[in-house]
Amino acid sequence: MTTDIIPVMSMSKIYTNKQKLTQVICAIVWCLLGSGVIFGFASIKPILIKEGIYSSLCSPEDDLPFGKACDNQDLKLNKLFSYGAAMTNLTSLIVGSLLDSYGPKFCGYIGCCLITLGSIILSYNQPLYQYFDSYIVGYVTLAVGGPFVFISCFQLANTFPKYSGTILALISGAFDT
C-alpha cells in the first residue's frame, strides 16, 4: 500500500511591500486619531470651560468673565485629566498581558470598542450626567482604549526590520500628538 504525501500549505500569507507599507501607515493614522486623544487636554480644556462643564461647582459669588474657570471647576477638570493619564499608564500593564495571550488583533478590537464607547458617552453626556459623572467615565474609557490601540501596533515595526526604529518612533509620535 502506498501513501501519497500531500504538501501542507503554510497558513501565513506573503504580503507585498506595498501592503506592508499601507498597514504601517494605517496604524500610524489610527494611533494619531484614536489612541492618545486624552493627551490633547490642554487644547480642549478652554472649550470645556466655555461649554460650562462642571460650572455648577462655581458659587454665584465667583464673578468670573466668560471662559474663565472658578477654582472648583478648574480642580475638577484637572482631576478629569489626572484620572485619564493614570488609567492610560495602568492599562498598559494589562494590555501587555492580553497581547501575549491573545495577540494584537484582539487588543486592537478591544481598543476600538473602548474608544467608540468613550466617544459615545462623551457625546451623550448631558442626559447621562444626571445618573453618573459621564465626563470622567467617558474620558477614562477613552484613556483605557488608547493603550490597546497603541501597543498592539508595535508589532508592525517587524514588517520592515531595517526601519523598525523609525516605525516605532512614528507610532509613538502619533500616540503623543
Report each predicted region and the residues it spans:
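Intrinsically disordered, low-complexity cytosolic terminal tails
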Residues: 1-3
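First extracellular/luminal loop
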Residues: 8, 12-20, 35-136
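Alpha-helical transmembrane segments of MFS and MFS-like solute carriers/permeases
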Residues: 25-30, 138-141
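Conserved glycine-rich helix-kink/hinge and helix-boundary motifs of the Major Facilitator Superfamily
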Residues: 28, 78, 109, 136, ...
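Transmembrane alpha-helical cores of Major Facilitator Superfamily
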Residues: 32, 79-86, 140, 169-177
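Intracellular juxtamembrane helix-capping segments at the cytosolic ends
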Residues: 48, 145-172
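Hydrophobic core of transmembrane alpha-helices in multi-pass small-molecule transporters
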Residues: 130-149
